[in-house]
């Protein structure tokens, strides 16, 4: 497979779902997926337009690797680079440079299970085994959100958060994550008009060297206006 849009195609994963071939690769930016079949020449012939597999790239999800379990079960981990936290300048004080982050380090993402849906596109969900790690559960009754801040009864550093929102076509919602008394917060924002799901990191830390640029991905809203989110929070990256 060749793609003139990229000068680098690395860390390829070729998955076979019957006769359908799924190629996942890392082009030194957001991870991409291409779907088709292997032709008589041994090349991948696409059956649909390619698209971004994960919008994190070097800022959160790169160089994923996939293993196959029995019954065509594909499980994937991605690299969450430590450098995504930000870099300490070379001319910074020694104490700061000694505590700097390194591009080659990081952690692995939570494992994902990959399947094909009826339209032939790739479905990506956290593996169900993660549910065994759940502890205390908090449930919030259905409520109507207004423009003012609605506090959620959640505290902690390891949280699995699931929510469903019925949105108007021009609505925008924001979820403030890890709010602190000193003003730190990370915002998960969704704009129904632009279908943009965005992680806003401008105020994530008081550390001036922390990465602050937003991460975003297009996420079309369902025709009935339903937005469903499942968010895993911790302090690993």
Give the ranges of each region predicted by the language model:
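Hydrophobic core segments of beta-strands in well-ordered, beta-rich domains
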Residues: 1-4, 10-15, 19-27, 73-82
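Surface loop/turn motifs at the tips and blade-to-blade linkers of beta-strand repeat domains
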Residues: 2-5, 55-57
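Beta-propeller and closely related beta-sheet repeat lectin domains
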Residues: 10-13, 62-65, 112
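Short, conserved beta-strand/loop elements in beta-sheet-dominated catalytic cores
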Residues: 23, 65-70
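Short, solvent-exposed loop/turn segments at conserved positions within beta-propeller repeat blades
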Residues: 27-30, 105
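Short gly/pro/ser/thr-enriched loop/turn and capping motifs at secondary-structure boundaries
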Residues: 31-32, 84
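Beta-propeller blade termini and top-face loops
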Residues: 32-38
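Beta-rich accessory regions
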Residues: 39-51, 55-59, 68-237
């Amino acid at each position: 497979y060749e793609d003139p849009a990229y000068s680098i195609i690395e860390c390829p994963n070729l998955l076979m779902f019957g006769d359908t071939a799924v190629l996942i690769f890392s082009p030194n930016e957001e991870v991409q997926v291409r779907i088709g079949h292997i032709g008589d020449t041994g090349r991948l012939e696409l059956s649909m337009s390619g698209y971004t597999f994960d919008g994190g790239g070097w800022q959160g999800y790169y160089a994923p690797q996939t293993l196959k379990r029995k019954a065509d079960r594909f499980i994937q981990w991605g690299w969450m680079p430590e450098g995504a936290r930000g870099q300490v300048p070379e001319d910074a004080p020694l104490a700061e440079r000694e505590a700097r982050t390194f591009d080659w380090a990081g952690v692995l993402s939570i494992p994902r299970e990959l399947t094909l849906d009826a339209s032939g596109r790739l479905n990506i969900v956290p593996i169900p085994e993660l549910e065994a790690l759940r502890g205390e559960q908090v449930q919030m009754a259905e409520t109507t959100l207004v423009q003012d801040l609605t506090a959620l009864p959640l505290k902690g550093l390891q949280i699995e958060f699931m929510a469903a929102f019925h949105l108007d076509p021009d609505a925008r919602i924001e979820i403030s994550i890890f709010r602190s008394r000193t003003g730190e917060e990370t915002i998960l924002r969704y704009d129904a008009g632009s279908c943009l799901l965005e992680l806003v990191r401008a105020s994530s830390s008081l550390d001036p060297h922390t990465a602050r640029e937003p991460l975003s991905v297009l996420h079309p809203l369902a025709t009935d206006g339903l937005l469903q989110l499942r968010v895993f929070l911790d302090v690993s990256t």
